[in-house]
Structures are given as structure tokens and as C-alpha cells.
Amino acid sequence: MRIVIFIFGILLTSCFSRNGIESSSKKIKISMLVDGVLDDKSFNSSANEALLRLKKDFPENIEEVFSCAISGVYSSYVSDLDNLKRNGSDLIWLVGYMLTDASLLVSSENPKISYGIIDPIYGDDVQIPENLIAVVFRVEQGAFLAGYIAAKKSFSGKIGFIGGMKGNIVDAFRYGYESGAKYANKDIEIISEYSNSFSDVDIGRTIASKMYSKGIDVIHFAAGLAGIGVIEAAKNLGDGYYVIGADQDQSYLAPKNFITSVIKNIGDALYLITGEYIKNNNVWEGGKVVQMGLRDGVIGLPNANEFEYIKVLERKIVNKEIIVPCNQEEYEIFIKQILKL
């Protein structure tokens, strides 16, 4: 049975056990493996920037940081992680749900190395090794806010969602977004599609262009680099075609077309957890899944203060007056029981 910890505020250390691996005062090497590309202007970029911040802020504790990216199969992930181990890494971060299985294997085989993984998808019966910390995010909470804004912003009454690969995490974006939109306007029409890629800019552009041609005027995406294609489609069409980004504030890419972005600040989460590890004399207290959401400040909208009603919704979500769906089953219950549709 896995143990899930809910983090409140930045009091991160209080949530971990005192049963970690051995401490050390030596300078450490921190490595990171991401699925995809490092400079994706989104998810992976945030994680990479966090490593660079750590090196700058803890020069007396960190010998070096190293990041690498790969898009491949399970054996490729394991091989690259083995190379990072051989390079002398003390702490290795894995970024992306595709690395879920690899995280369990390498952490079990290398108990003296500390591991962290962002966005894994574990079954309820998975035992998390004591040298592994898993971090997951309540992205549906931020997507709910984005969906509410999209429904209010749309002039056509039609909005869209483009996800990358179908799965738990992308579905959380989708159903959070759709729930928020329906909460704002029960009659809003929503079309959702998947690009089946986190790296194909062209397919993102193609799907978005088709959506816009059908009268959709707001698209939220959670599709990695494929999302760049969505932005390009809106930018090329000009005024009246809007996008809502994911993971980082991407508004600088098309200021006239962006409404907001659903921030999933994995960089802050990675920085906080690693920083506590360093401050705690290199004791990595794992064996747990840590959930972070709106309450923790790592999920949200960068311009939430521009929308008065969003602050009200945030409070309702944090206080559990609104329980945001993260999958299709929960969404259907939400629609029937909460919205009476």
C-alpha cells in the first residue's frame, strides 16, 4: 500500500519520516533525466531551471548538476539512469510519467542513491522504495480555473482542449478544464482531442487550426512541444483566437492570444524538496508519494488576480467546497450530481 502525503504551504520537512538513507556532509552531484527535450518552454524547462537555481544557491553543498533528455523506450531510460549512477550522482531526478517503471527498478537496485520522480503513475498497491520520493500534482485544480475563464471569455460558445498522450496526467488537465467550463456555463460546447505526441509541433498546429475553423475561439493545451503548434496557429490567425497554456507562463510567446496558463511549477517543487535534502545533511527521506496543489502555491494561474471570481473559486477548491474531477468517471459524476446536467 503506498503512502500519500498532502503538503500544506512550504512546511515540506514535517511531512517526511525520519527514516531516510544515511547522511553525508560531502559535496553532492545532482542529475536529472527528462522524457522529451530539455528546452520545451514548459514542463522540462521548469525542472532544468530549478537545478540551475540549486547550483547557484547552494555552491558549498553541490559539486555539479547535470541534465539530460531522452525520448525512447524503457530500456533506454534504464541505460541512461545507469550512466548517471556511474557518473557519481548522489541524487537523480526523473521527470515525466514515462519514467514511472524505471524509477521503481533503479531505486530498488541502488539503495544508496537518492531518487525523485515528477508525475509518476503508480498503482495503489505499489510499495515506494525508501530512497525514492514521488511528487504528483493536482493539475485538475488549476485547469478548472482555466476552464471557467475560457467559458466566460468565449464569444462563440465553443472551446477546445488538446492533450498530448492520453493518460492520467493529461486527463486531469482535460477533465478539470471541462468541469470548470461547465461550472461557468452549462451550455458551453467543448471539443477535446489528443495529439498523441508531446514533441510534434506540426500536429499541434494542425489540430488547433481545424478547431479554430469550426468556430472554437479558446483552446487549452497540455501537450508539451505540440502545444507550441497550438500557439502558432492562434498567433497566425490573429485577434479573437485564444490559447491557454500549461506548466509555465507561456504568454510571452503570443501576448495578444494568451488568456492565461495553468501553472504546474514542478521547478519549485523540485527545488523545495532538494533544498530540504541539502539542509537536512543530505538525508533523503523517501518511501512516499507527495501531492501538491493550489494550497501549496505550485498550481495556479499567473494572472489570477486579474479575475475577481477566480479568487473565490480558489478558496472553494482549497476549502474542498468544490472537489475537482481528474478523470472521466469523476467528471460524469460531477456533471450529474453537482451541475444537474
From Swiss-Prot:
It is found in: Cell inner membrane. The keyword Signal applies. Its main location: membrane. This is Basic membrane protein B. It comes from the Bacteria. CDD domains: PBP1_PrnA-like. Transmembrane segments: none annotated. Monomer. It comes from Borreliella burgdorferi (strain ATCC 35210 / DSM 4680 / CIP 102532 / B31). PROSITE patterns: PROKAR_LIPOPROTEIN. It is a lipid-anchor. Changing residue 45 to A: In strain: 212. One of its GO terms (cellular component) is plasma membrane. A lipid is attached at residue 15 (S-diacylglycerol cysteine). May be part of an ABC-type nucleoside uptake system involved in the purine salvage pathway. A lipid is attached at residue 15 (N-palmitoyl cysteine). Keywords: Cell inner membrane, Cell membrane, Lipoprotein, Membrane, Palmitate, Signal, Transport.
